[in-house]
Every structure is written in C-alpha cells, then in structure tokens.
Amino acid sequence: MTTMPPEMSATTAAPVGSAPSATAHHPAAVGGGMPRPASPAVGSNTTTATATTATRSRFMITDILAGAAAASAAAAAAAAALAAASSGGGRGSPTDSEREQSLVAQHHHHHQQQQQHHHHQQQQQQQQHQQAALQQYIVQQQQLLRFEREREREREREHYRERHSPPGNNPYAHHPMPPHLLAHFPPAHYAVLQQQQQQQQQQQHPHPHHLQLERERLEALHRHGHGLTGDPAQHLSHLSHLSHQQHHPHLHHPMHDERSRSPLMLQQLGGNGGNNNNNNNNSSSASNNNNNNNNSASANSNIISGNSSSSNNNNGSGNGNMLLGGPGSSISGDQASTIDDSDSDDCGGKDDDGDDSMKNGSSANGDSSSHLSLSLSKKQRKARTAFTDHQLQTLEKSFERQKYLSVQDRMELANKLELSDCQVKTWYQNRRTKWKRQTAVGLELLAEAGNYAAFQRLYGGATPYLSAWPYAAAAAAQSPHGATPSAIDIYYRQAAAAAAMQKPSLPASYRMYQSSIPPGMSLPGMPAPPPPGAAPMLSGYYAAAAAAAASAGAQQQQQQPPAASRSPATSQSANSEADCERTSSSSRQRLITPSPPLNPGSPPHRERINEEEDRERDEERDIERERERERERDEDDEEELALEV
C-alpha cells in the first residue's frame, strides 16, 4: 500500500471526533517531534486545518478502499475465468469429435434426402413423359381414325350420289340454298347441298392435321424434285398463314386460296357436284387453284380456267378421282410413282415364284372396303439391301443345304447374320426364282448340245435308263446304290426337265430313245413316233439318227401292215423280242464303257409305268400339300409382321 502523508497518519492516530485541545496539548504529534511554542492564535488555526484534513482523508480512504475492492473483484473474476478456461480446455477434444460426428451424420442424412428427392423427381418425370407419349399416341390414333371415318363417309356419299344422282348437269351445283329450303328437294339434291355446306365449312376451318399432311407432302415433292406450279416457298408460306389463321379464328375469311387443301378435301371437291369454284374462279391461269395436281395420272381434277362454264372439270360428273393414287389411296406424290419389285424387302407382296400376290392400285368406282384394304397394303418401295460378302456366302451355303427354310431356321439365320426375318425371306424367294430359271436354262442347253450323259448325271441315280426316265424318283428310291432325293428336288428336276424339253406331251425319255424303236412298232399306251423335225432341240448325231429312223420307219410301214392291225399275241411277242435285244445291247454297252449309254434302252412295262404314275401322282400331291403348308406359314408370318408394324 502507498504511504500516507503525515497529516493523514496524525488524523488516523487521533479520533475523528477528538477535541482540539488534545492536539494542542501534544505538539510533538503534530509537529513531528519538534516542540513548538503554544500561543492562542496558532492553536485555533491548527484545529481548523486538522478538521479539514480529516474530512479529506476520509474521502480518500473510501476511494482507495473502493478501488482495492474493485481490483480484488477483477482479480477474482480473472482467476475464475482462468479456472473456467483450464477446465474447458480439459473437456475440448470430446466435444469437437462429437460435433464432427453430428455434422457428418447430418450431412449424410441430407445427402440421402437429396438423392431420394432426385430419384423421386426422375420417376415423376419419366411417368410424365410416358403419360405424355401415351396421350400423344392416343391423339394420333384418334386423328387417324377420324380421318379414315371421314374418308369412308365421303366414299359412301360418292357412291350414293353416283347411284341416285344423274351424271349430267346439276342445276343446283352453283346455287347454294339456305337450310330452310333443303326439305323441299329430293334426297339426292338434299345430300348434294348438305355436302356443299360441309365443304364451305371445311374451306373456312381447315383441320390442323390436314395442314400438317399437306405441308409434309409439299416438302416431299420439293425435296424429290417434282414440279410445282409456282414457288414452293409460297406454298409453305401459305400453309403457315393458314395455320396462323387456325390459331386465330378472327382472321378467317371465306375468300382464301385453295392451294393447301388436303387430298380428302380435293376428293370431296372433285367427287361431288358442289360449288367448289366459288374461290378464284375469275383467274385466267390454272396455277392459282389446286396446285396439288402434281401427279400426271390425276391431273384432271379441279383445274380452273377463265371460262365460268368450264370452271371445274369434275363438276356434276360424279367421278371423284382422288389426287395421288385413287380414292382409296393415302400415299403422297412421291410414293404414288413407285411400286414393289422383286428385290424390295417387304414380306407381304411376294410368293415363292416371285409373283406379286398383292396387286397395287385401285379403281375409281370399286368397293369402299377394297379401296381401304388396297390403300393400307400399298407401301413405299424400300431400298435394296446391301448384303456383305459374309452374309452372301452364308446365305448361299444355307440355300445349297435346303431350298426352303422353316420359320425357326429363318429366324436363327437372320439373327446370326444380323438381318431381319423379312430380308432373309425375300432373299430366299429371289434365290429360288433364280435357281429355277438357271436349272431350266442349263437343262435346255444340255439337251440342245446332245450331252445326255450330263443330263442323266444331273438327274442322278444308279440305273442309266431309269435315271433318264421322268419317273426316276421311285426308281432311285428302289435302287440300293442311289441316294434318295427329296420330294422338292424331284419336283423341281422334273419341272426343269419339262421346261428344257419345251413341255412336250410325251415323257422326256421317249424323245431320247424313240429313234431306236424298231420300225412299225409302237410302245404300249404311246402313239407312233412323230415325223422328222418334231424334236427341234436335238442336234448333231441325235438329230441325224432321229431323221434316219423316221425315214426308215416310213419305208418299212409301206412294206408291212400297220401295228394296229396285228393281233395282240404278235405285237406282244415282237415287243418281248425287241426288249430282249435292247436289254442285251445295253448290257454289252455297260461292260464296254462305264459312261452312261447313248441309247438307254427300253422303257418300263405297262404295269411298271402305271405304278410309277401312281407314285408320281402321290408325290405331286404331297408336294402340293407341302407347298400349301409353306404358303400358309408365309401368310401367318406376313400377318404377324403386319400386326407388329
């Protein structure tokens, strides 16, 4: 503590309320040990100074005590804060770890919530997209159904008008009547006038689906280079103007251009006898009205001329020729000029012979149901498939193994080659047609060249004379050394042989050995040999031998009676002798050379021929049944493909 001044110490030593005489009687305490002389004046001054000093000292002590208390309180607070800080420092690490753990847990929970929310949003978006796509598909189907119903109704109206209205001039064609006067006319006139009113409404309020179809059609025509009377940009701008009018009904006006009408509206305009020349009839050119006449096959509908009497070529005629492919057609201009060929990839238009089983096209006055079916069957020609070398080699190997594929084999082959089932089927159809043509041409060339040995090898079989016989299938089946050909191969070999021999009325082998038959003798059940020149396809040695045999037969017929006048026993004995001679000669030829003989020998007997004919008929019936089953399977496949499309 600080030292007190002398007067404070004196005041502290003496009581506060002490009498002044006490200080006066002790001069040493006041003077600091130095005695002073006592006088009355000095004593009074000393008493006053002592009282003032005592009062000041009391306040100073109070201040000092208050400051000391404040300092002690501050020290205590600092000590408490230090103690609190030390105790808090001891517990700091577990609090931080717990806080970190809680933060990590909160972050993980928040991340999970975000993921769940995002997944839920994705699911909702997918559901919304699916619902929107489904709604759009339903709307499109409804529009197509509505469009088809409108076309059906229009065709029914056309047929009704064609049956009940006269084909001549219609006096009410150019004069629309108010609705309250329609009841005073016959039903035919009433239908015509009602159709006119519907046309006016459709002209003023075109359907947006019709506008979209027409826009796509014009773009396709412009893209494929078809001639448009006028600038294509004007057509597209006009279509946009009409679509703008469709969205803004207050902009509609009855005197707009008719260039953007759909094929349905053009059919309605061309089929009825209505007032479809109420717009732009005063124009002197044909390009200001109905510029949809881009197809030359349907250029006779709605061409406007300057003369009002011939303002419409189809007025009152009842002939509702629809633009771009007939009344039942729904194809565009570029599709109407193309039809399917044998190399297209469609599966619905070909049978096994490469012929069209669905004939495209429709007549203007046919049945409405047939129009609809033909319009649905008519498709745009697809591009030819570009097969790779590997695909072609695999297809050729498969075709060598079997000429006809089952549905399962065809699907497996298509999956192996990464092709569609339709492409494999079309390739097989075309390849079968080519194979039949090549087989027929090859056999014809062999027959013309006289190479009957190669002809017999092509047929196959162990017995030479039976291999050349048309009924070689049963003989080859009976032969222990020859492989049994399939019924399909037998059928096509015989068909190719018939084509090579120009489809003669006699068996093919009869033409081979007819030159070796003895003169004046005929085979049982067969007519006499034809005159020289009856076998134009034989050449070289065979042609000369046939001519010599025919001339010798004619000379001997003059010397001997005809074979028909002989008795049955004589003819049978002669036949048996000829058979023995021919059998011995054929056996000698087989011993001399291993190649097939040029003269194969006699044909089988009557009983064997009958058996062969019966077996051949049975085989032909089996082949026909198999082909019918194949066609049914193809038709089922086509129906399945049509349903999938």
Swiss-Prot record:
Keywords, sorted A to Z: Developmental protein, DNA-binding, Homeobox, Nucleus, Phosphoprotein, Sensory transduction, Vision, Wnt signaling pathway
Pro residues composition-biased segments: 594-603
GO MF entry, a single one: RNA polymerase II transcription regulatory region sequence-specific DNA binding
Lineage top rank: taxon: Eukaryota
Tissue expression: B-H1 and B-H2 are abundant in the eye-antenna imaginal disk. Expressed in R1 and R6 cells throughout larval stage until 30 hours after puparium formation, at which time expression is seen in the anterior and posterior primary pigment cells. Coexpressed in embryonic glial cells, neurons of the CNS and PNS, most latitudinal anterior cells of the developing notum and the central circular region of the leg and antennal imaginal disk throughout larval development.
Start-end of Basic residues biased regions: 106-121, 244-253
Biased composition (Basic and acidic residues): 149-165, 618-632
Comp. bias intervals (Acidic residues): 633-645
GO CC, alphabetical: nucleus
DNA-binding segment(s): 380-439
Region Disordered, residue ranges: 1-50, 86-134, 149-176, 240-259, 265-385, 553-645
Biased composition (Gly residues): 317-328
A Pfam family the protein falls into: Homeodomain
InterPro entries registered for this protein in UniProt: HD (IPR001356), Homeobox_CS (IPR017970), Homeodomain-like_sf (IPR009057), Mediator/Homeobox_domain (IPR052145)
Keyword Kinase: no
Subcellular location: Nucleus
BP GO annotations: chaeta morphogenesis; compound eye photoreceptor cell differentiation; eye pigment granule organization; eye-antennal disc morphogenesis; leg disc proximal/distal pattern formation; negative regulation of transcription by RNA polymerase II; regulation of transcription by RNA polymerase II; sensory organ boundary specification
Family in the record: Belongs to the Antp homeobox family.
Function statement: B-H1 and B-H2 are regulated by members of the wg signaling pathway; wg and dpp. B-H1 and B-H2 are coexpressed and functionally required in R1 and R6 receptor cells and primary pigment cells for normal eye development. Coexpression is also required for the fate determination of external sensory organs, formation of notal microchaetae, formation of presutural macrochaetae, antennal development and for distal leg morphogenesis; segmentation and specification of tarsal segments 3-5.
Protein's UniProt name: Homeobox protein B-H2
The species this protein was found in: Drosophila melanogaster
